[in-house]
A protein has these predicted regions:
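Short, well-structured hydrophobic secondary-structure segments
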Residues: 39, 44-49
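Conserved beta-strand-loop-beta-strand hairpin that lines the nucleotide-binding pocket
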Residues: 1-6, 48-123
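Conserved short strand/loop->alpha-helix "switch" segment adjacent to the catalytic nucleotide/phosphoryl-transfer site
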Residues: 17-41
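Residues in soluble alpha-helical coiled-coils and helical-bundle/repeat scaffolds
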Residues: 10, 28-31, 106
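STAS-typified acidic loop motif
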Residues: 6-18
Length: 123
C-alpha cells in the first residue's frame, strides 16, 4: 500500500520542526521514524537556508511498506553540494547526514524550483 501526503511549509525557521511533526504523523504505522525525521529536518533546513526566501517550501512524503520518500521543493538557483565543514562549525553537515541515513537521494530541477528527495528505510 502507498500513501502520499503533501504540505506547504513556511519559509522560516519553524519549517524544520513542522516537517518533523508531519513525518511522525505520516509514519504512525512504522516503528522507527528517527532517521526519517532527521532527513526531513535537514532537507527543509537546506531549502530554507539556501533557497531564495520566496514562496513556501513544499514537502511531500510517500510511504510504502518499507520505504518513506521525503521530497522537499523550494525556489532555488543552486543545486545540492557537499562542502567541507570544520569540526566546530554549526553547519555544513546536512547532506552528509542525508547521504548516511538515506538508502538513496537526489535532486530534480523544475523551472525555478529545486526538489531534493531522499528514500529512508522504514522497518
Amino acid at each position: 500500500m502507498t500513501a502520499t501526503f503533501t504540505w506547504d511549509l513556511p519559509m522560516d525557521s519553524t519549517a524544520a520542526a513542522i516537517a518533523r511533526q508531519h513525518v511522525r504523523d505520516a509514519a504512525s504505522t512504522t516503528n522507527d521514524v528517527i532517521d526519517a525525521e532527521l532527513v526531513a529536518s535537514e532537507l527543509v533546513t537546506n531549502a530554507w537556508a539556501h533557497g531564495r526566501g520566496t514562496g513556501a517550501i513544499t514537502m511531500t512524503i510517500t510511504v510504502t511498506d518499507d520505504v518513506m520518500r521525503l521530497e522537499v521543493c523550494s525556489d532555488s538557483d543552486g543545486i545540492p553540494n557537499q562542502v567541507a565543514s570544520r569540526d566546530e562549525a554549526p553547519e555544513g553537515r546536512g547532506l552528509l547526514l542525508i547521504e548516511k541515513l538515506a538508502i538513496n537521494w537526489g535532486h530534480d530541477r523544475r523551472d525555478s524550483t529545486l526538489c531534493v528527495w531522499a528514500d529512508v528505510q522504514c522497518p
